[in-house]
């Protein structure tokens, strides 16, 4: 059995660790709730934006709208955006996203380009031999609309070249506080069938006039949509990451509680043994006439 001092030191270390894990649990809970609010607000914006885009698509025939973002049949490779966290201690959150990304990348044989958002995922991808051509950090800790706009401009710029014909985003979709799952979503090109389940707004019979042209108007909507979509991805990923970290820290705190209980019992036993040994030594000394 360890000495009383050794057990005390071990117990103190575990108690300090518990304070840290519990603080991280509380912080992750707060950040998760904040991210969930942003997800809800941004979802309303995206729904309105998609409804407007559907209004345009529903009132134009295929040959009336020759937009470069709609059902483009050009050849080329694909762009994959992989969204993970900047920090660890969040269970299997990052590894699940990277695993899905690797699976999707293996389906392409024409050298797709990878863009990483998140330090953890960037390192995991490089460890697996996938080197991102662009990397952004800070999206998980401080997701902003400005960063979403920067990423959107880069993605649209790549898509409009002759080298790429598809853009995919791999991230963790937030369903609820109990359910989050890694998902790969095609962002570009936009297909008419993508808007079948979107509820239209306004007068469905009214004639729309587009100035300066329908393509210019739709172009602007696409830029706003891609920016809004990436911001939504940031928020869903942030909520999912903080739930994963919250669960990991809660589990760590519970394990610390169990260890503290075990060490406290061990400390009491060590103290009793120490007292017993001291009494035995005193008794032996009395019998031998040492006292």
What are these regions (language model features)?
Residues 1-291:
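C-terminal beta-strand-loop-alpha-helix "lid" module of Rossmann-like NAD(P)-dependent dehydrogenases
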């Amino acid at each position: 059995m360890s000495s009383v001092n050794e057990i005390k030191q071990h117990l103190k270390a575990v108690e300090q660790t518990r304070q840290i894990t519990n603080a991280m649990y509380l912080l992750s809970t707060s950040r998760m709730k904040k991210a969930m609010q942003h997800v809800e607000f941004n979802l309303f914006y995206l729904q309105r934006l998609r409804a407007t885009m559907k209004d345009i698509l529903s009132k134009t025939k295929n040959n009336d709208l020759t937009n470069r973002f709609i059902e483009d049949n050009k050849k080329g490779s694909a762009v994959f955006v992989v969204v993970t966290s900047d920090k660890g201690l969040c269970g299997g959150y990052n590894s699940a996203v990277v695993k899905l990304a690797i699976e999707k990348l293996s389906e392409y044989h024409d050298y797709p380009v990878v863009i990483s958002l998140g330090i953890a995922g960037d390192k995991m991808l490089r460890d697996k031999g996938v080197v991102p051509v662009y990397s952004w950090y800070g999206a998980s800790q401080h997701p902003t609309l400005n960063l979403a706009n920067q990423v959107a401009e880069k993605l649209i710029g790549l898509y409009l070249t002759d080298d790429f014909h598809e853009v995919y985003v791999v991230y963790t979709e937030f369903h609820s506080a109990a359910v989050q799952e890694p998902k790969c979503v095609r962002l570009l090109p936009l297909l008419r069938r993508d808007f079948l389940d979107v509820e239209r707004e306004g007068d469905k019979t009214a004639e729309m006039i587009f100035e300066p042209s329908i393509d210019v108007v739709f172009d602007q909507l696409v830029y706003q949509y891609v920016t809004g979509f990436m911001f939504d991805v940031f928020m869903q990923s942030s909520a999912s990451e903080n739930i994963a970290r919250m669960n990991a820290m809660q589990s760590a705190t519970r394990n610390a509680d169990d260890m503290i209980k075990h060490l406290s019992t061990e400390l009491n036993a060590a103290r009793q043994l120490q007292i017993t040994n001291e009494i035995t030594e005193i008794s032996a000394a009395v019998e031998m006439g040492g006292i």
